[in-house]
Amino acid sequence: MTTLLAAGWPVLITALVLGYACGAIPFGLILTKFAGLGDVRTIGSGNIGATNVLRTGRKGLAAATLLCDALKGTLPVLAASHWGEGPALAAGLGAFLGHLFPVWLGFKGGKGVATFIGVLLALSPVTLAAFAAIWLGLAFALKYSSLAALAASAATPLILWALGHGAVAALFLVLAALLWWKHAPNIRRLAAGTEGRIGKKG
């Protein structure tokens, strides 16, 4: 704990705020408007993330949204890491909170999977590989993207802890809990058997 706080509270708070500012950039909304598709919040789930952007029928735009939403988790963490581990973790938390609760959109943001991945890429690429393996395996086997993401996110702090990254594991325990909370509608649909499957239309 002492090591994490070594940079001092001003630096930690600065990293948190800068991370939030990056995370709060609503790329899904910006890209769809720039492409002349209007407000992505008026279609599908009303979410600003890549999955809902995909419902516009523009796969390239959805891929760009996914990449941008991931990078807004990766870049602040890498930048803040020059100040130490504590600021890097603070920047990751800030970026994730910014994506979920962007001040510009009345604190109504995305569900966090892409930004979760982006932060994980910066802090533990090895764990990201495990996340991807879990997600891809379950998505291929069960055809539920949301279930695969939920399972992979839940496994992430356990994997980090097993690898000896205690502080990072603690951060991702918080991020995973928030991600699950944002996926509450998906969880209810999974329980009811009404969640949409990968590749199924209608």
Curated annotation (Swiss-Prot):
Compartments it resides in:
Cell inner membrane
User: Pfam families under this entry?
Assistant: G3P_acyltransf
For this protein, the record's InterPro entries field holds: G3P_acylTferase_PlsY
Q: Which residues cross the membrane?
A: 11-31, 87-107, 116-136, 158-178
Name the catalysed reactions. Answer: an acyl phosphate + sn-glycerol 3-phosphate = a 1-acyl-sn-glycero-3-phosphate + phosphate
> Which EC number(s) does the record attach to this protein?
2.3.1.275
* Pathway the protein acts in: Lipid metabolism; phospholipid metabolism
UniProt-recorded Gene Ontology molecular function terms: acyl-phosphate glycerol-3-phosphate acyltransferase activity
Q: Which domain of life is it from?
A: Bacteria
The annotated topology with respect to the bilayer is: Multi-pass membrane protein
A GO cellular component annotation here is: plasma membrane
Protein keywords = Cell inner membrane, Cell membrane, Lipid biosynthesis, Lipid metabolism, Membrane, Phospholipid biosynthesis, Phospholipid metabolism, Transferase, Transmembrane, Transmembrane helix
Enumerate the Gene Ontology biological process terms.
phospholipid biosynthetic process
Q: How does it assemble?
A: Probably interacts with PlsX.
> Per its UniProt record, what NCBIfam families does this chain match?
glycerol-3-phosphate 1-O-acyltransferase PlsY (TIGR00023)
What the protein does? Catalyzes the transfer of an acyl group from acyl-phosphate (acyl-PO(4)) to glycerol-3-phosphate (G3P) to form lysophosphatidic acid (LPA). This enzyme utilizes acyl-phosphate as fatty acyl donor, but not acyl-CoA or acyl-ACP.
Which family does the UniProt entry place this protein in?
Belongs to the PlsY family.
Listed name of the protein: Glycerol-3-phosphate acyltransferase
Protein species of origin = Methylorubrum extorquens (strain CM4 / NCIMB 13688)
Q: Which gene encodes it?
A: plsY
